[in-house]
Amino acid sequence: MRTDDILKIAETIDNAGYYSLECWGGATFDVCMRFLRENPWERLRQIKKVCRKTPLQMLFRGQNILGYKHYPDDIVDRFTALACENGMDIFRVFDALNDPRNLEKAISCVKRYGGHAQGTLCYTTSPVHTVESFVRLAKVQEAMGVDSLCIKDMAGILTPGAARELVGALKKALPKMPIQVHSHMTSGMAAAMYMAAVEAGAGCVDCAISSLSSFSSQPPTESVVSILESEGYDCGLDRAALTKINAYFKDLKAKRQPASSAKVEPVDAGVLVHAIPGGMISNLRSQLAQQDALDRLPDVLEELPKTRADLGYPPLVTPTSQIVGVQSVLNVLAGKRYQMVTDETRRYAAGYYGRTPAPIEPKLQKKLVGKLKPVTCRPADLLEPGLVAAADALPPNTIKAEEDILSYALFPEVALGYFKWRNADPKTREPIPADLEASASSPSPAAHPTPAGASGSAAKGDATFLSQEETKGTPVLAPLNGTFYRSDALGKPKMAEDGAAVKAGQAVCVVEAMKLFNPITAPAAGKITFLVEHGKAVTKGQPIAAIA
């Protein structure tokens, strides 16, 4: 959805009587530059010009800001300041692991610059996620100074009974704290759950206009309003405005919706078993399709809860949903669990993302962590300031405003691509990709640029390549369809030089697949010769190097 699409209906939305309008943050920032060729900061400014009555709200991933890794405190601070200056009002601050250490800096910055800091409880179910544990977390966030609390039910698994119990416990423990509830219609329960939450004391619920609602979206605004008003609650919304808003987006949706999305079932009761958010299932389908293994989706859905339990029951929200999801896919495709482990899984197990809700079994943790040094402090304490370095790394002719430096600090390759396009002063923008939904659901946390063709479709190798039989020496095979890289991060040296002696088990290259890096180890000792150029697409089973 382009900014122009939003602005055409923004005044009507502003006059409808909403408590707030979520319009920024999360994946939208990345998508603006990557796919829409728009400046996300300008989008915020334009919406604020029109929406003067309704507070604007954003999704803020704590120390991850809007990205998929932790950022230094100076970047968190300056990003928050500029977001407030450009019109943001309410910051929903959350951490995928519910680790308070990853929230404190973001919350303090929001408060310092005059924003409304909304704390968040990422809701999930597990032996360690209890009402008592959520109340304890809420009290910690209250002590940090949050202005309100959100119960964030990413998968749509919060039942009416559980909502009544949780909201009731929160209101009892924190009687003055406003409670907001966010859910998805994946399981079909969210509207009923909202009613129970409101009866227990919640003052606000998240909805989507009916033409954009349901399944992995929110419950329909009009229906929830009718339910609440039938029970004597006054929502204060203008029904005529809602009708106009719905008609507008219904027409826009018909023009923009990919034909494939019409095939999605309106309710997935399976989420009550596997607890996987709807958007994550879409991403799993996309990842398996890239590996020509879509028929293995049932196996992955069965494996994922086991992997999640192994990794300490993290809530399935960005970035942990991507880490757990890809590791589950690898466990299925490799035929043996944890035979292949992504760098992100290793870093997660070592504590680089924060404290896991439950401890990882020591033997498995040792295997996953490998040679990484475990992190016991707040992960961001290990990071050097990054704002000056980001500014120095940008060519001067690409910077038009300070916001550009922040965009680059968060998404280096995506921002550079956008700046290059912007400097070319194009007369028209590219059409919005038809496979945008699948490709944008979990953008890459990787340090390499995403290669053309790697988004939304299987990466294909060269038309011809050496077979295992033609390869001299012991072949190093690509374990997945993806993109071959000689280094494990942008700007880093090659992991192994041509002709160098390598040891068995030594990491010699990576294959980027499913938007995460997969280290490839030498199957034998000897001298290595690479058969594929850096940055080229490869297919599963293709020899990428030989050891003699």
Range-by-range predicted roles:
Residues 13, 93, 149, 201, ...:
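Conserved, mostly hydrophobic/aromatic
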Residues 20, 24-142, 155-159:
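Active-site beta->alpha loop and helix N-cap motifs at the rims of alpha/beta catalytic domains
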Residues 450-511, 519-527, 531, 540, ...:
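Acidic, low-complexity mobile loops and tails
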